[in-house]
């Protein structure tokens, strides 16, 4: 790779580190090109999966202020740069690694700090943002309905009591006639 190409590659990787919400470092030793294409499709539009030379990635990480990942850049390295919610991409990587033993998740970077393999897997086990928001909305609606029923209960009881008293009075008046 010529020097200008290396400079461009470092700049591009540094830019990806800066714009991504998370990055997952993987080893892809033994994956065919067809499998890499399949993985890229599984990751979706919000994630860029890039194979890169370790020295260039180290320089790019240093340039963008990313620290603590140097030990991950050993062997054939590819990085999934995730823009947006990291849950779906982490799920896709975990599933793909389960089906293809040649893909090894080494760790990653999120919220300004390195994350371990177990943290990446924990993120993959989370519900997506949409599912979590749906659960929250459902719980809030149930609590609102419960609160409305509690507030309406005294008024309903008072109305029933008034109706019972009125029936009793009307019943008492007809007996007196």
Swiss-Prot record:
Pfam families: Ribosomal_L10. Part of the ribosomal stalk of the 50S ribosomal subunit. The N-terminus interacts with L11 and the large rRNA to form the base of the stalk. The C-terminus forms an elongated spine to which L12 dimers bind in a sequential fashion forming a multimeric L10(L12)X complex. This is Large ribosomal subunit protein uL10. HAMAP family: Ribosomal_uL10. Coiled coil: none annotated. It comes from the Bacteria. Belongs to the universal ribosomal protein uL10 family. The gene is rplJ. GO terms for cellular component: ribonucleoprotein complex; ribosome.
């Amino acid at each position: 790779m010529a020097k200008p190409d290396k400079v461009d590659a470092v700049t591009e990787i540094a830019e990806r580190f800066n714009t991504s919400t998370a990055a997952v470092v993987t080893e892809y030793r033994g994956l065919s090109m067809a499998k890499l294409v399949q993985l890229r499709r599984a990751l979706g539009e919000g994630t860029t999966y890039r194979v890169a030379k370790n020295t260039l990635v180290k320089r790019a990480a240093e340039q963008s202020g990313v620290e603590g990942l140097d030990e991950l850049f050993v062997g054939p390295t590819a990085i999934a740069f995730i823009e947006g919610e990291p849950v779906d991409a982490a799920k896709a990587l975990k599933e793909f690694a389960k089906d293809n033993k040649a893909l090894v998740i080494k760790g990653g970077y999120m919220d300004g700090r390195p994350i371990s393999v177990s943290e990446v897997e924990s993120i993959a086990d989370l519900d997506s943002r949409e599912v979590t928001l749906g659960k929250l909305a459902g719980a809030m609606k149930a609590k609102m309905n419960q609160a409305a029923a509690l507030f309406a209960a005294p008024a309903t009881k008072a109305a029933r009591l008034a109706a019972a008293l009125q029936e009793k009075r009307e019943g008492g008046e007809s007996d007196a006639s």
